[in-house]
């Protein structure tokens, strides 16, 4: 019966795991026979097999979900976005480079209806559709078909899937694999990580897994403490009994941290370390507030010493390849990557967008339109590996889908976050009426949030920052995890008047 009630959870988890195992979702042709069926399964789970409350029948659960779906602006915005992505299939133009013989013979390169969204390659557009349709169907399923327990279970599955993908790295290294999952699909025998053909994408993926794992571990600690208080047992005795139950989530969390470091992605090295430090301080602050003053002083000294030892060992025992990447990190380099200074991609992408500001040039259109915009000097320095990306996800999406497409995506993101921000406001108001000993640490704006929600937001911000200087969100494994984890945040929020 529990399995039946969790069908929606498992089908969303299956879609997220499929993206990550199908080479991060970057191999478009491999998604075609898989992802449409998984999207249909999630849609079936959303409409027919939503999770039920304890005193609810299946019919009542379906009625509840259908009613909320119809009233939710997010549903209609997502459907409108799907229609927007479908229009280019009916409005195909020609590529100045790929279709040059046809254009030279007199063919009109413009799409049949110039004032509507278009593409120059339908298979490329289909690849983008296979990113967003399953991802956003998963978002609706998580929001409406999963209860709070289902949302939490989903993220547990995602974290353990990340753990398996990290273990794959060690196995591939030991067996001398020449490509992801022992295939020859990698562009370079040394340039892949786990199932990802581009290590920088893998770095962002494992950074997110690390943040999610850390947040779930914090939640596990709080649940155990609440259980001990309710049962009224001796805490010292139970702390030994429940040690494994308290801390087993640190295993995938630690493995994901080292996996992110070992991708040798400088952005991931910086971001995963920063997230680790922030979550360490957040955890220490919350725990110290619950202790008496003598225990607080003792724990503070021990914690500071432990942190100093970890930092010292990290600096002294850092592997040579990691040290080599860390040595190249400086403020100027970071700003250059985020602004695109010194690379032609940002200038070329901006030039293309100015010519097609509203609807862009269609899925993967940048690679078809970039060469005519390049100077002779830039053509001589043409980037062969990774040159189809702007290495700025925000700008590339704007170029390929225009202001309208970017507007849809921004609206969807706001609608996902809006219910959580309302509950956040309720928690802030409620915290002001608590007794001083019961209040969260300062600043309340941060510590009033449950730790998993704070960790999810940190991971999302890290991905958005990384996307300014690279292309992590061109991997649907990361794109789907970004949106779905944000949609799952309400599984950790306490009930308020805006629940």
Locations of regions flagged by a protein language model:
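Juxtamembrane membrane-water interface segments that cap and precede transmembrane helices
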Residues: 19-22, 107-121, 183-196, 340-344, ...
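Helix-to-loop transition at the C-terminal end of transmembrane segments
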Residues: 25-28, 90-100, 170-181, 316-324, ...
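Short, charged juxtamembrane terminal tails flanking transmembrane helices
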Residues: 496-499
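TM-adjacent membrane-interface loops and short helices in multi-pass inner/ER membrane proteins
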Residues: 198, 343-387, 394-397, 401-408
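N-terminal hydrophobic segments of proteins, predominantly signal-anchor/transmembrane helices
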Residues: 11-26, 43-134
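Extracytoplasmic catalytic-loop and juxtamembrane helix elements of membrane-embedded
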Residues: 98-111, 177-192, 321-338
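Alpha-helical transmembrane segments of multi-pass inner-membrane proteins
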Residues: 1-21, 35-47, 82-83, 123-318, ...
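Flexible juxtamembrane loops connecting transmembrane helices in multi-pass membrane enzymes
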Residues: 191-195, 275-276, 295-297, 312-354, ...
């Amino acid at each position: 019966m529990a399995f039946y009630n969790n069908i929606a959870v498992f089908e969303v988890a299956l879609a997220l795991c499929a993206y990550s195992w199908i080479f991060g979702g970057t191999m478009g042709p491999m998604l075609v026979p898989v992802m449409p069926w998984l999207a249909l399964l999630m849609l079936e789970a959303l409409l027919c097999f939503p999770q039920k409350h304890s005193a609810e029948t299946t019919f009542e659960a379906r009625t509840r979900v259908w009613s909320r779906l119809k009233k939710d602006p997010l549903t209609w915005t997502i459907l409108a976005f799907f229609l927007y992505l479908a229009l280019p299939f009916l409005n195909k133009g020609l590529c100045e480079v790929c279709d040059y013989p046809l254009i030279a013979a007199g063919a009109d390169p413009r799409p049949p209806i110039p004032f509507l969204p278009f593409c120059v390659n339908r298979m490329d557009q289909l690849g983008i559709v296979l990113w967003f349709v399953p991802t956003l169907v998963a978002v609706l399923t998580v929001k409406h078909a999963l209860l709070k327990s289902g949302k939490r279970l989903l993220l547990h599955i995602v974290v353990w899937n990340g753990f398996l993908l990290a273990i794959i790295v060690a196995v591939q290294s030991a067996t001398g694999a020449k490509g992801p999952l022992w295939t020859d699909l990698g562009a370079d025998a040394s340039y892949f990580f786990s199932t990802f053909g581009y290590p920088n994408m893998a770095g962002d993926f494992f950074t997110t897994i690390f943040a999610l794992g850390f947040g779930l571990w914090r939640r596990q600690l709080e649940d155990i403490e609440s259980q001990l208080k309710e049962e009224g047992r001796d805490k010292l005795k139970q702390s030994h009994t429940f040690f494994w139950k308290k801390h087993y989530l640190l295993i995938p969390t630690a493995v994901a941290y080292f996996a992110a470091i070992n991708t040798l992605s400088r952005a991931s090295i910086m971001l995963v370390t920063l997230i680790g430090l922030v979550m360490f301080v957040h955890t220490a602050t919350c725990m110290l507030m619950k202790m008496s003053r003598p225990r607080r002083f003792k724990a503070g000294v021990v914690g500071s010493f432990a942190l100093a030892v970890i930092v010292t060992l990290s600096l002294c025992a850092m592997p040579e390849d990691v040290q080599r990447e860390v040595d190249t990190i400086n403020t100027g380099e970071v700003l250059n990557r985020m602004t695109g200074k010194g690379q032609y991609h940002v200038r070329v992408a901006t030039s293309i967008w100015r010519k097609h500001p509203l609807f862009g040039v269609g899925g993967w259109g940048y690679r078809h339109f970039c060469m005519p915009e390049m100077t002779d000097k830039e053509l001589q320095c043409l980037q062969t590996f990774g040159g189809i990306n702007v290495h700025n996800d925000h700008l590339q999406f704007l170029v390929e889908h225009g202001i309208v497409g970017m507007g849809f995506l921004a609206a969807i993101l706001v609608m996902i976050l809006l219910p959580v921000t309302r509950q956040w406001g309720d928690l802030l108001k409620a915290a002001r009426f608590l007794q001083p000993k019961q209040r969260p640490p300062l600043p309340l704006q941060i510590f009033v949030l449950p730790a998993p929600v704070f960790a999810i937001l940190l991971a999302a911000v890290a991905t958005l920052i990384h996307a300014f200087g690279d292309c992590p969100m061109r991997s649907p494994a990361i794109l789907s995890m970004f949106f779905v984890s944000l949609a799952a945040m309400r599984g950790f929020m306490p009930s308020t008047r805006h629940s």
